[in-house]
A protein has these predicted regions:
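Charged, amphipathic alpha-helical linker segments immediately N-terminal to NTP-binding catalytic cores
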Residues: 2-42
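N-terminal pre-Walker A segment at the start of P-loop NTPase domains
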Residues: 34-56
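Phosphate-binding P-loop
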Residues: 56-63
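Hydrophobic anchor at the beta1->P-loop junction of P-loop NTPases
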Residues: 68
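Conserved lysine of the Walker
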Residues: 76
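Hydrophobic positions on the alpha1 helix immediately C-terminal to the Walker A/P-loop
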Residues: 79
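Flexible phosphate/Mg2+-sensing switch loops adjacent to catalytic phosphate-binding sites
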Residues: 84-124
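Conserved small/polar residues in nucleotide/adenosyl-binding loops
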Residues: 142-148
């Protein structure tokens, strides 16, 4: 047996080294959602995000902002892009973004899943863009990807 045959997915497939906002075609979205790994730390971030997001759905809040910070290469953009798919209720090949989390057991906490499903089922306009490409400020000063979500 060869080592490459021990993996669930082909190891010689195209794997994006850097997640970019502009890669929104169905093939890329499907790969990102199916291969996204939710670590214990990310489980906490998903729980916090969707618990707070639910506050705006079921009630009123003036706390609307979210700050995502971390070192270069730590997965901020990837996390944000996955959040955008969930909030947009993105569908690829008949499968909703939330389904990747449920079926693949990426999130197992039923309360977090309930909050995620509520968010996915609540209509929202999600606009995801890289501020570098929309700004006249030199690239060295801008390293933000901003989603705009309107309920």
């Amino acid at each position: 047996m060869q080592i490459k045959n021990m993996f669930a997915k082909q190891i010689d497939r195209d794997i994006k080294g850097v997640i970019k906002v502009g890669q929104g075609d169905d093939a890329n979205v499907q790969q990102e959602l199916s291969e996204y790994v939710v670590t214990r730390e990310l489980q906490k971030h998903f729980a916090d995000f969707f618990a707070n997001y639910k506050t705006g759905i079921v009630g009123n809040t003036d706390k609307m902002g979210v700050w995502i910070s971390g070192f270069f290469g730590s997965g901020k953009s990837h996390f944000l892009k996955i959040l955008s798919y969930l909030l947009d209720n993105r569908e690829v090949d008949g499968k909703r973004a939330i389904d990747y989390f449920v079926e693949d057991k990426k999130i197992t906490d039923p309360y977090v899943l309930a909050d995620m499903k509520l968010a996915a089922d609540t209509p929202a306009d999600v606009i995801l863009f890289n501020i570098d490409s929309k700004s006249e400020i030199p690239v060295s000063y801008t390293h933000l990807t901003l989603p705009t979500i309107r309920l």
